[in-house]
Amino acid sequence: MTELNKLTVADSIKGLKNKDFTSTELIGAHIKQIEKHRNLNAYVTETFDLALKQAEAADQNYAQNNARTLEGIPFAAKDLFCTKGIRTTACSNILKNFIPNYESSVTQNIFDKGGVMLGKTNMDEFAMGSANITSCFGNVISPWKANDDNADLVPGGSSGGSAAAVSGFMASAALGSDTGGSVRQPASFTGLVGFKPTYGRCSRYGMISFASSLDQAGIFTRSVLDSSIMLEAMMGFDEKDSTSIKAEVPELQSAIGSSMKNMKIGVPLSLGEGSIIEPDIMKMWQDTIELLKNAGAEIVDITLPHAKYGVAVYYVIAPAEASSNLSRYDGIRYGLRVERENMTLDEMYEMTRSTGFGEEVKRRIMIGTYVLSSSGMDAYYLKAQKVRRLVANDFNNAFAKVDAILLPAAPTAAFKIGEKQNDPTIMYLNDLFTIPASLAGLPCASVPAGLSARGLPLGIQIIGKQLDEYNVLKVASTIESGVKHIKFEPKGF
């Protein structure tokens, strides 16, 4: 029998219903795996006592035939989802000992359906990063290694801990957040399915904010079916979030294995020209186009003329929103406070924030403060908002002709820890293909579609119309079936 911690969410649900094993046994197998691979630094807070207590309650519910949809299923949560009574830090020194007195809506939704939380996962500080190297708890190491090198690789970011946990069989599923690609890019780097729903589908209540008009909860799983199961549990209108969409949660699981007949897939190949895209990624993109064509889809050449400005636009709008959101961390109400004798209030603010925030967060706060200043507002911020609307219009025009759009999730495979650390511009370009859909608030997923010449996973991205998670899953499922001969599993796990 497959090791319990290697079961998918769907297979775990089936096994628990059939009484092949108990939730306590399932959770125990995951705890052992976490303890075995602590060197990866995927978790920053382990909640094993809570998990075993929840597993015991799940076993009782199964015994009484009262099992809910996710009863007894182990998951992890990125450490920016507030968890009542459990430390939540956003992996920043400024919140290192913060314990919330309320629960985020997304984690509450999963708990209400029987999910069992194993712990909180590492991340880039305040979700600012593409490699999980800005955390105050240290780097996350990917479970994957290249076949020609034993060097430690990044898992992607900012949700790198969640990606490492699921890829390394330390959780069946894990919550992430996606602002400009922070679920899709790590999923691509670690051979997982990473899904970002339509902006507003999942409540942001209790999610520590980075950029409010872009942040959206997402999910990492090892199969497309698992994504559909978790999304059905996570999504839903929430009156506590003013940006929450009042729309019915669709039935998504029937999308798996659906026919591609009459589906039109848009491919903006021009976006790959002159970019930093690696040859392996280009080949994987072309191979996936052929796969979908052979599955019955019609491939349509499209253009997204303003998508190439996405990174520039994002790094004006997101830092602007971050500088506003992070102004609340002043040492007065909660979090870190740095004091010394005879210190003025202004000095206390300055010392607290300069000590509590890391270098990347400070960089983005300074950028954001400048673009919102009187000299930067017209020159940068308002222009960026105009181009954001043009990016969204490009997608609207494309979706008048196609049902989904196909793009790589990242321009490269995973790289070595420290390799690009000192060049923020190169690091920012990692989100070249994910940012446009974020600016437009569209549902999208990364699904494993191939391996590089060095044996590293490569993800393809499917972008759908607003609120059309169903067709994104449908295309993702077809791709998953077409590459099932490839084993997306790190060696030694």
UniProtKB/Swiss-Prot annotation:
Q: Which InterPro entries match?
A: Amidase, Amidase_CS, Amidase_dom, AS_sf, GatA
Q: Which family does it belong to?
A: Belongs to the amidase family. GatA subfamily.
Look at the named UniProt entry and state the broad enzyme category this protein falls under: ligase
- NCBIfam families xref list: gatA
Q: What is its EC number?
A: 6.3.5.7
Provide this UniProt record's keywords sorted from A to Z: ATP-binding, Ligase, Nucleotide-binding, Protein biosynthesis
Q: Give the record's GO CC terms.
A: glutamyl-tRNA(Gln) amidotransferase complex
Domain of life from the UniProt record: Bacteria
Tagged with keyword Protein biosynthesis = yes
Subunit annotation: Heterotrimer of A, B and C subunits.
Q: Name one GO molecular function term.
A: glutaminyl-tRNA synthase (glutamine-hydrolyzing) activity
Q: Which reaction is the catalytic activity of this chain?
A: L-glutamyl-tRNA(Gln) + L-glutamine + ATP + H2O = L-glutaminyl-tRNA(Gln) + L-glutamate + ADP + phosphate + H(+)
Matches recorded under PROSITE patterns? AMIDASES (PS00571)
The protein depicted here goes by the name Glutamyl-tRNA(Gln) amidotransferase subunit A
Which gene codes for it?
gatA
Protein source organism: Rickettsia peacockii (strain Rustic)
Per the UniProt entry, the disulfide pairs are none
Q: What Gene3D superfamilies does the database record attribute to this sequence?
A: Amidase signature (AS) domain
